[in-house]
Swiss-Prot record:
Its EC number is 2.5.1.6. One of its GO terms (cellular component) is cytoplasm. ATP binds at residues 16, 167-169, 238-239, 247, 253-254, 270, 274. Belongs to the AdoMet synthase family. It comes from Leptothrix cholodnii (strain ATCC 51168 / LMG 8142 / SP-6). This is S-adenosylmethionine synthase. It is found in: Cytoplasm. The gene is metK. CDD domains: S-AdoMet_synt. Homotetramer; dimer of dimers.
Length: 393
């Protein structure tokens, strides 16, 4: 009997309130790194109706107009009208940053196990994942969920569907047969819109047609769409009130959207607003880099990496590889190859992936992984041939 199951992942648009917060936090980080890439940054953001609160810990020599950075980010997303719930020109922006604790800084500056190296900025566990379901070596449900909300923004910004507003969510339910993607069972797309697209609580018929034909169908592989595929477009109907007016937004609340859509475990640490001495971010990027190179090398069809750290200690507590039976050599041997070819100490990660750069705002919407952006060094597969040769393949 075929191993037939359904698996679902979701994504949210750049105008979703939590993603607005993430993008502001990473825009702050980038603005600081443009002047002082050795800064320590933990920038948190809250968004609500007409209000942005910036808080956290920042130690830097940079001089940044944090309020203007927040406004510019909100403008770029498309919140330029008070009818949308927040307007970059008129919203209140409150700033409440402290400096990084000296107690934390001493352990990061000089690792207890290697005084010349950088210690991990906190304890914790991180996961990386890759699989052969898509050319980008990402799970198909999260990959296509991202592409749906990304296209929503494109159609909104270029004027092809001018009734769209910034807030949106997508969800893709994939049917698997024999452990491989077979077809799409259900697509959910909810998007904020201008008032004339609804009659009472219901949407006008042309709205459904435009979303299905212009937004959804161009994104998804035709071979995965069947007569049984369900389209749920704005299933609750009217969606005029959205963004920070519809829900309070906070940095770090979309960690599954940011990673693999639930296809592998998550260590719990968010990414946005954090400089790369925080292993929550940098080690998760490194784990993706490792996993992707293992799959690209043909050592496994899917690969999950777990790493863990202790605060102030450079070397990871463990590097564990799981290939779920798809590996061509034992997982323990793959783990030894990882230790030999990747420096997963915090300083090693920062150097390996060139992370002391203002590259982070782009990561804060549409996923940190599975995107072939030139700044996303963790998406390179430059170690694949080395790993393949070392494995004797």
């Amino acid at each position: 009997m075929a191993n037939d199951f359904l698996f679902t992942s979701e994504s949210v648009s750049e105008g979703h309130p939590d993603k607005v917060a993430d993008q502001i936090s990473d825009a702050i980080l980038d603005a600081i790194f443009e002047q002082d890439p050795r800064s320590r940054v933990a920038a948190e953001t809250l968004t609500n109706t007409g209000l942005v609160v910036l808080a956290g810990e920042i130690t830097t020599n940079a001089h940044v107009d944090y309020i203007q950075v927040a406004r510019d980010t909100i403008k770029r997303i498309g919140y330029d009208n008070t009818e949308y719930g927040i307007d970059y020109k008129g919203c209140a922006v409150l700033v409440a940053y402290d400096k990084q604790s000296n107690d934390i800084a001493q352990g990061v500056d000089h690792a207890s196990d290697d005084h010349l190296n950088t210690g991990a900025g906190d304890q914790g566990l991180m996961f990386g994942y890759a699989c052969d379901e898509t050319p980008e070596l990402m799970p198909a449900p999260i990959y296509y969920a991202h592409r749906l909300v990304e296209r929503q923004a494109q159609l909104r910004k270029d004027g092809r569907l001018p009734f769209l507003r910034p807030d949106a969510k997508s969800q893709v339910t994939m049917r698997y047969v024999d452990g491989k993607p077979h077809s799409i069972d259900t697509i959910v797309l909810s998007t904020q819109h201008s008032p004339e697209q609804s009659l009472g609580d219901k949407m006008i018929p042309s709205f459904y047609e435009a979303i299905r034909e212009e937004l959804i169908k161009p994104v998804l592989p035709k071979e995965w769409i069947t007569a049984e595929t369900q389209y749920l477009i704005n299933p609750t109907g009217r969606f005029v009130i959205g963004g920070p007016q519809g829900d309070c937004g906070l940095t770090g609340r979309k960690i599954i959207v940011d990673t693999y859509g639930g296809a592998c475990p998550h260590g719990g640490g968010a990414f946005s607003g954090k400089d790369p001495t925080k292993v929550d971010r940098s080690a998760a990027y490194a784990a993706r880099y490792v996993a992707k190179n293992i799959v690209a090398a043909g050592l496994a069809r899917q690969c999950q990496i777990q790493v863990a750290y202790a605060i102030g200690v450079a070397r990871p507590m463990n590097i564990t590889v799981y290939t779920e039976g798809t590996g061509v050599i034992p997982d323990a041997e793959i783990a030894k190859l990882v230790e030999a070819h990747f420096d997963l100490r915090p300083k090693g990660i920062i150097q390996m992936l060139d992370l002391l750069r203002p590259i982070y705002q782009k990561t804060a919407a549409y996923g940190h992984f599975g995107r072939e952006e030139p700044e996303f060094t963790w998406e390179r597969t430059d170690k694949a041939q080395v790993l393949r040769a070392a494995a004797g393949l």
